[in-house]
């Protein structure tokens, strides 16, 4: 089972699209996109994604990608 990375379409439009495109190239991740993840406050203040159900943020797409990989390393699924 791969880590699940979920993106909100509104946040993609705010800048996290680049992070999604980078992460989609990793065959060890399941990357999904939803209309809304109901984290509107978080969505307005930063780039974010849900990683296995937990919010991970970043100031830039590159920082978001780095933070996602760090989160996955620090929080193994098994």
Curated annotation (Swiss-Prot):
Belongs to the UPF0349 family. HAMAP family: UPF0349. This is UPF0349 protein RBAM_029300. It comes from Bacillus velezensis (strain DSM 23117 / BGSC 10A6 / LMG 26770 / FZB42).
């Amino acid at each position: 089972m791969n880590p699940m990375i979920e993106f909100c379409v509104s946040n993609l439009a705010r800048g996290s699209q680049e992070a999604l495109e980078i992460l989609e190239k990793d065959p060890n991740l399941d990357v999904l996109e939803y209309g809304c993840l109901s984290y509107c406050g978080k969505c307005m203040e930063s780039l974010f994604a849900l990683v296995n159900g937990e919010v991970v943020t970043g100031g830039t797409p590159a920082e978001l990608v780095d933070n996602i990989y760090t989160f996955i390393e620090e929080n193994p699924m098994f």
